[in-house]
Amino acid sequence: DDPYNPYKYSDDNPYYNYYXXXERPRPGSRYRPGYGTGYFQYGLPDLVPDPYYIQASTYVQKMSMYNLRCAAEENCLASTAYRADVRDYDHRVLLRFPQRVKNQGTSDFLPSRPRYSWEWHSCHQHYHSMDEFSHYDLLDASTQRRVAEGHKASFCLEDTSCDYGYHRRFACTAHTQGLSPGCYDTYNADIDCQWIDITDVKPGNYILKVSVNPSYLVPESDYSNNVVRCEIRYTGHHAYASGCTISPY
């Protein structure tokens, strides 16, 4: 996979494997450790979720089942949402939060599933290349027991943005999914399934636990920075997040 190969250019993603002539490394120049070097090619990715991004934009929202049809198809709701007596005008209470994951490793993070098995989601009109990119759980603050039915979030992996000096190479398409070193995959809180269904949760103090690559399906150089834990105070109408930190468990 040569990033300078012009035949890899894609109209679906003009940034894929594309470098402007002015930004392309000059022959004979000193390369930093990165793409195209032995250090990079034999390295490993390292995913790190952003705790401050989650803390800044966590909130509670009520939505009708009518507006949650796509999410219901992707099993993003608690089991009580699938009872036979649930109607379109019934509401669910959702704890929404964003997620931004950086690959700070030295190699691409590539989907665990081969391309031919990526799953097409007709509601959202894109392919999901991983069934378990993230786990979302809500735990009791004192007992650490799970109080809400968190779900396994499948993702469409792409380079949403990159640090200065790095370039986007992957997009949410049928053939270019992944996360490059120095780049971020970002999901805002208003996207479907960026939530935990807390309809059946009582007001109280909880822990929001967000894990990336939770089943270690993709090898990484460091698994100890894959979890964010946040303190959540839920009043029954509002949620307040604080103390979000990277956690080893």
Curated annotation (Swiss-Prot):
Cofactor note: Contains 1 lysine tyrosylquinone.
Record cross-link Lysine tyrosylquinone (Lys-Tyr), residues: K152-Y187
Recorded catalytic activity of this chain's protein: L-lysyl-[protein] + O2 + H2O = (S)-2-amino-6-oxohexanoyl-[protein] + H2O2 + NH4(+)
Positions of post-translational 2',4',5'-topaquinone modification: Y187
Chain residue ranges for the region called Lysyl-oxidase like: 45-249
Gene3D superfamilies attached to this UniProt entry: Immunoglobulins
InterPro entries cross-referenced by the UniProt entry: Ig-like_fold (IPR013783), LOX-like_protein (IPR050912), Lysyl_oxidase (IPR001695), Lysyl_oxidase_CS (IPR019828)
Site (Cleavage): D50, P51
Enzyme class: oxidoreductase
Subunit structure of this chain's protein: Interacts with MFAP4. Interacts (via propeptide) with EFEMP2; this interaction is strong and facilitates formation of ternary complexes with ELN during elastic fiber assembly; this interaction limits interaction of EFEMP2 with FBLN5.
Job of this protein: Responsible for the post-translational oxidative deamination of peptidyl lysine residues in precursors to fibrous collagen and elastin. Regulator of Ras expression. May play a role in tumor suppression. Plays a role in the aortic wall architecture.
Protein name in the entry: Protein-lysine 6-oxidase
